[in-house]
A protein has these predicted regions:
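Extracytoplasmic metal-acquisition and chelation regions
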Residues: 1-150
Length: 150
């Protein structure tokens, strides 16, 4: 919301004649985000386990804003996942009853197998969509489905 206010104010200064359109778009965006936030919180409240691990360094903001229980972050490349590291990953996920493992891309088959063996669910989120609000909505939906076991 706040960043949208700043951007809208800048746009009005650059294009004063478009002020009514800019303000209408800002109001629509804020309403969309408010509804999205309320819907997401309601869905989160029904999840039994909010523990996650991220194999990407892209999602700190998302994890924090949803108040998820972050067990760990390990953004190492697929080539650095040794058999011992994969065993440790599986153990960490099992020991901490991690519901969802987040990534910004499909990991290697070996990493997928380690996640599956632990009983956690892999959720691959988008990081480069053209529409950031739609991307956020889609990512949160995928994450909430993963947390609920859907």
């Amino acid at each position: 919301g706040r960043m949208a206010d700043v951007m809208a104010a800048d746009l009005v200064r650059l294009a004063p004649a478009d002020k009514p359109t800019i303000e209408a778009n800002l109001a629509a965006l804020k309403q969309r985000l408010l509804k999205f936030s309320a819907d997401s919180e309601a869905r989160l409240a029904s999840a039994d386990n909010l523990s996650v691990m991220s194999l990407s360094d892209h999602f700190g903001y998302l994890i924090g804003s949803l108040n998820l229980e972050l067990i760990g972050v390990d953004p190492r490349p697929d080539t650095e996942w040794t058999p011992e590291a994969l065993k440790q990953l599986t153990a960490t996920l099992k020991d901490n009853d991690v519901a969802v493992v987040m990534h910004h891309r499909q990991p290697s088959d070996a990493v997928k197998a380690a996640i599956a063996e632990s009983g956690s669910r892999l959720v691959v989120l988008s990081t480069d969509a053209a529409d950031p609000v739609a991307e956020l909505e889609g990512n949160v939906d995928l994450l909430l489905k993963g947390l609920s076991g859907a």
